[in-house]
Regions:
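Adenosine-nucleotide cofactor-binding segment
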Residues: 12-73
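Rossmann-fold dehydrogenase core element
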Residues: 85-87, 98-137
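Conserved acidic E/D residue at the C-terminus of a beta-strand in Rossmann-like folds
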Residues: 23, 90, 114
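Hydrophobic/small residue at the entry helix of a nucleotide-binding pocket
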Residues: 2-3, 11
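Short conserved AdoMet
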Residues: 55, 68, 81-82, 159
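Generic hydrophobic/aromatic pocket-lining and core-packing "Φ" positions
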Residues: 8, 29, 73-77, 100
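C-terminal hydrophobic helical "lid"/dimerization subdomain
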Residues: 74-78, 117-170
Length: 170
């Protein structure tokens, strides 16, 4: 979704050798392929095997988990190579458990936390300087008078919506 794509934009600033994005929604896959053609997309079912085959060390050096489901949490650490970093961007509805016997020998580093407000100035500067282009994320625009319609579109994920901009000056 939008958080995953924004995370992708930040990852792209680091120019990694490969970026692999695991996505199950076909509209989002098309969006990613259209706007970010260097990003490799893969389905959740094929992700672990694809990551291991594509990477140099039998797994990803860094994994960012953005979806927030129990299955995606597990997939994140399973795709990580030994001694990798797994960053949790997602917010979960319930506590996740670390199946330590399954993880034994991976020596993973987990980084967990929400949005850090102290980085907002840097993020806005990156956008203003054109280093992060968020314009493709705004797929729909509505006047303030139609805010309920805009929210309904976004909430129900219709018409390929990623983000909705609301114009307040109409």
């Amino acid at each position: 979704g939008p958080t995953g794509i924004c995370t992708l934009l930040c990852v792209m600033l680091k120019n990694p050798k490969h970026i692999i994005m695991c996505e199950k929604d076909e509209e989002r896959i098309q969006f990613i392929n259209k706007h970010y053609p260097d990003v490799l997309t893969v389905s959740p079912e094929e992700c672990e095997e694809f990551v291991k085959k594509t990477s140099d060390h039998g797994g990803a050096d860094v994994v960012l988990e953005v979806a927030g489901a129990e299955s995606t949490f597990r997939l994140a650490w399973e795709c990580a190579r030994p001694n990798a970093i797994v960053t949790i961007v997602a917010l979960y509805d319930k506590a996740q458990s670390l199946p330590l016997p399954d993880m034994y020998g991976k020596n993973l580093i987990f980084k967990i936390g929400g949005v850090d407000g102290c980085d907002c100035d840097e993020t806005l500067k990156l956008i203003a300087d054109g280093k992060i282009n968020t314009e493709p994320l705004i797929t729909h625009t509505y006047p303030l008078s139609k805010i309920e319609e805009a929210y309904d579109l976004f909430e129900n994920k219709r018409d390929g919506v990623i983000k909705v901009a609301v114009e307040c000056w109409h």
